[in-house]
């Protein structure tokens, strides 16, 4: 039962990532229809192929074994999807870009500045998201072990690198030479 809840949370996060690409662009009923179709036709098959030792795993009769196989039929290079890197981030990212291209620009795009209007709530949301990703990545090791610690540290290092890049980008954009 716990694993079902864990997997449903991953599906909810994947659809939430796509929702950021279509804010102010589609009606809610249309969005719910899209989510149902996307989870059924894209997310669930991809989860089965990557996380269940099927088509895209390290099993001997998969695509990775045929493309990068050794003489004994095992995959020499197999995808490692820790905490949903390909299933969640890649599939929802590509789907979000495709959806944004199909739907078109936002109505308010380039008409008014898109600044955060409630900075404490923005920071609270960022902190909650940070805690959630640390939990997802650490929890994907299914135990308090070295793998969970490495996942936690990698998540922290990636967040710090992103923050430094954001600060550098804001400094480059907002200052004049």
Residue ranges and their predicted role:
Residues 1-177:
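Hydrophobic alpha-helical transmembrane bundles of multi-pass membrane proteins
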């Amino acid at each position: 039962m716990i694993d079902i809840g864990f997997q449903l949370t991953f599906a909810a996060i994947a659809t939430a990532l796509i929702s950021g690409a279509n804010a102010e662009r589609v009606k809610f009923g249309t969005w719910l229809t899209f989510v149902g179709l996307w989870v059924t036709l894209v997310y669930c098959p991809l989860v089965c192929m990557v996380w269940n030792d099927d088509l895209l795993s390290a099993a001997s009769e998969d695509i990775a074994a045929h493309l990068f196989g050794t003489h004994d039929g095992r995959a020499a290079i197999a995808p490692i999807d820790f905490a949903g890197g390909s299933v969640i981030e890649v599939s929802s990212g590509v789907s979000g870009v495709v959806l944004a291209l199909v739907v078109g620009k936002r109505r308010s795009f380039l008409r008014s500045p898109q600044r955060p209007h409630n900075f404490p709530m923005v920071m609270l949301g960022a902190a909650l998201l940070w805690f959630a990703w640390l939990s997802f990545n650490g929890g994907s090791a299914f135990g308090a072990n070295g793998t969970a610690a490495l996942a936690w540290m990698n998540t922290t290092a990636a967040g710090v690198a992103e923050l430094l890049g954001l600060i550098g980008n804001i400094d480059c954009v907002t200052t004049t030479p």
